[in-house]
Amino acid sequence: MDNIFGSVKGVFCLGATHIAERIDENGKPYNCTADDAAYSIFEFEGGVIAKFNSSWTTRVRRDDLLTLHVDGTKGSAVVGLRDCWTQHYGNTPKPVWNPDIPNPIDFREGWTKVPEQEDFDNAFKAQWELFLKHVVLDTPFPWNLMEGAKGVQLAELGLESWEKKTWIRIPNLK
């Protein structure tokens, strides 16, 4: 996320196990010990706020299974697994709230799909190829030990936020 939005300054995360009992491959029920949903809010340097929600129990009524929503003062973006939609500040509808009549605004209308400029390969494959080239040919590799440590730190602080039900500030690693 640092490479797209900037450094993460804070996080609130709530995880949940919405389906406590599952059925295994043999048709036998078992108690689930894994969370099946994560709801997170991130604050980035510069004031950008992003909401990442992921759930295996969602009945999808959005563009994709995973949706990342990022708001800024000049516009917003909604990103799925394949597509990105943006809405500039100037295209944002200005509704008047009136619960007595149907809403006349189609809020999806003012969004613009970001055009695909190139074909993308499988992301996991591409990262492995970059890593193997780094190991064999000593080519640059942007995801070093510090980047890994920042990822572990964010995951641990996300779990702490969930456990304490509170906003957590992210300290800088050195």
Residues covered by each model-derived region:
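Solvent-exposed polar/charged
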Residues: 2-6
